[in-house]
Amino acid sequence: MFLTALLWRGRIPGRQWIGKHRRPRFVSLRAKQNMIRRLEIEAENHYWLSMPYMTREQERGHAAVRRREAFEAIKAAATSKFPPHRFIADQLDHLNVTKKWS
């Protein structure tokens, strides 16, 4: 009985990586270095993003002309797929051959 208790004593109950009594995962030196590097990159990104390239006045409407031209190009491409307009006067013009009163 004491031998069984001794052999089963150091075991983690259930799944060893999840749950209330899980095995603790120790942080390695490489994991610390990776975390420090990622935090430094994030701090640099925050620094560069905190200083805008353009002022609010410059930024407002700076792409309006380009967007309008792109929209006009899309609209022209869409309308070019349609056939030209056909009018009833042109379709029925052959019936006007025998008009006597004009």
UniProtKB/Swiss-Prot annotation:
Q: Which GO terms describe its cellular component?
A: mitochondrial inner membrane; mitochondrial large ribosomal subunit; mitochondrial ribosome; mitochondrion
**Subunit details for this protein?**
Component of the mitochondrial large ribosomal subunit (mt-LSU). Mature mammalian 55S mitochondrial ribosomes consist of a small (28S) and a large (39S) subunit. The 28S small subunit contains a 12S ribosomal RNA (12S mt-rRNA) and 30 different proteins. The 39S large subunit contains a 16S rRNA (16S mt-rRNA), a copy of mitochondrial valine transfer RNA (mt-tRNA(Val)), which plays an integral structural role, and 52 different proteins.
GO MF term (any one): structural constituent of ribosome
**What is the first-listed, main subcellular location in coarse terms?**
mitochondrion
List the PANTHER family hit by this protein, alphabetically: LARGE RIBOSOMAL SUBUNIT PROTEIN ML63, MITOCHONDRIAL RIBOSOMAL PROTEIN 63
Could you tell me what this protein is called?
Large ribosomal subunit protein mL63
The coding gene here is MRPL57
Task: Give the subcellular location.
Answer: Mitochondrion
A Pfam family of the record is MRP-63
Report the source organism. Homo sapiens (Human)
Q: Which family does it belong to?
A: Belongs to the mitochondrion-specific ribosomal protein mL63 family.
- Record keyword Ion transport present: no
One GO BP on record is: mitochondrial translation
Cell inner membrane as a keyword?
no
Keyword line: Mitochondrion, Ribonucleoprotein, Ribosomal protein
